[in-house]
Curated annotation (Swiss-Prot):
Belongs to the NanE family. This is Putative N-acetylmannosamine-6-phosphate 2-epimerase. GO terms for biological process: carbohydrate metabolic process; N-acetylmannosamine catabolic process; N-acetylneuraminate catabolic process. It catalyses: an N-acyl-D-glucosamine 6-phosphate = an N-acyl-D-mannosamine 6-phosphate. One of its GO terms (molecular function) is N-acylglucosamine-6-phosphate 2-epimerase activity. The gene is nanE. It holds the Pfam family NanE. It comes from Listeria monocytogenes serotype 4b (strain CLIP80459). Pathway: Amino-sugar metabolism; N-acetylneuraminate degradation; D-fructose 6-phosphate from N-acetylneuraminate: step 3/5. The keyword Isomerase applies. The lineage of its organism: Bacteria, Bacillati, Bacillota, Bacilli, Bacillales. Converts N-acetylmannosamine-6-phosphate (ManNAc-6-P) to N-acetylglucosamine-6-phosphate (GlcNAc-6-P). GO terms for cellular component: cytosol. Keywords: Carbohydrate metabolism, Isomerase. It is an enzyme of class 5 (isomerase). InterPro entries: Aldolase_TIM, NanE, RibuloseP-bd_barrel.
C-alpha cells in the first residue's frame, strides 16, 4: 500500500479538514462534506482529526487520509496523537497515513516515541507514519526513529519555534529540513496562500498540507475584515 499511497499524493495538495469542539463547524458530517468539496477542487488527500470524523470522511471520498487525534493531557504539551492509545485508535480506522507529534518533548505518561512506533508497526505493518516536527532537532529525531514521512506541522507552534513562519527568511527552515533528511517532506503549517503552496513544492517538498486557508471560514473572514479595517 505504501508506494501506491505515496504516488497518489506526490506533488499535490492535501487539505486539512478539522474543526475543534469550540468551533462552529465542529461536526463529523460537516467535515465529511468539507472533505468532499476539497477533493472536488483537486485535493489529492485529506488530513482529519478523530476516528469519528475520519469514518464520516471515508464514506464520502476515496483519496488517502492522514489521520490524527488531538488530545490534551495535563502532564505534557504534546497533543497530536500523543500516546499509543490514540495512535492505535486512528490506525484502526484504516487510514493510509497516521501523523503524530514527533518533537523531542516529554510525552503524556512518559511514553517513549520510539516504543510507540515500534509497537504500532507490529500491529499495523501496512500503515505509513508521518512525523509532525517543529525544530531541525525534531527532524533528526524523527528520521532516526524511521518515520515514513517528515512534516513541518509544528514549526511555529512549539516553545522553541514560537511565532515563526515557514516562509520566514525565504523558507530557510524548510530548506534546512529538506537538506536534513532523505525522507519525503510534507510542508504544513501557516501555508496560507496558493503561492506559498506552489513555492514549497518547487523547493522539493513531496506534498503540501493546507488547512485554515481553505477550511476555516472564521479565519478566512478575519483576514478580509482586518484588511478592510485599514481603510
Amino acid at each position: 500500500m505504501g508506494n501506491s499511497v505515496m504516488e497518489k499524493i506526490k506533488g499535490g495538495l492535501v487539505v486539512s479538514c478539522q474543526a475543534l469542539e469550540d468551533e462552529p463547524l465542529h461536526s463529523a458530517f460537516i467535515m465529511s462534506k468539507m472533505a468532499l468539496a476539497a477533493v472536488q477542487g483537486g485535493a489529492v488527500g485529506i488530513r482529519a482529526n478523530t476516528a469519528k470524523d475520519i469514518r464520516a470522511i471515508q464514506s464520502e471520498i476515496d483519496v488517502p487520509i492522514i489521520g490524527i487525534y488531538k488530545k490534551d493531557y495535563d502532564d505534557s504539551d504534546v497533543f497530536i496523537t500523543p500516546t499509543l492509545k490514540e495512535v492505535r485508535e486512528i490506525c484502526e480506522t484504516g487510514v493510509e497515513i497516521v501523523a503524530m507529534d514527533a518533537t523531542t518533548r516529554k510525552r503524556p505518561h512518559n511514553e517513549d516515541l520510539k516504543d510507540i512506533l515500534n509497537a504500532i508497526r507490529k500491529e499495523f505493518p501496512n500503515t505509513l507514519f508521518m512525523a509532525d516536527t517543529g525544530s531541525i532537532e525534531d527532524v533528526y529525531y524523527a528520521d532516526s526513529l524511521g518515520f515514513d514521512l517528515i512534516g513541518t506541522t509544528l514549526y511555529g507552534y512549539t516553545e522553541e519555534t514560537a511565532n515563526k513562519n515557514i516562509s520566514d527568511d525565504d523558507f530557510s527552515h524548510l530548506k534546512e529540513v529538506l537538506k536534513s533528511t532523505k525522507r519525503p517532506v510534507i510542508a504544513e503549517g501557516k501555508i496560507d496562500s496558493p503561492s506559498k503552496a506552489r513555492q514549497v513544492l518547487t523547493l522539493g517538498c513531496y506534498a503540501v498540507v493546507v488547512g485554515g486557508a481553505v477550511t476555516r471560514p472564521q479565519e478566512i473572514t478575519t483576514r478580509f475584515t482586518n484588511e478592510i479595517k485599514k481603510i
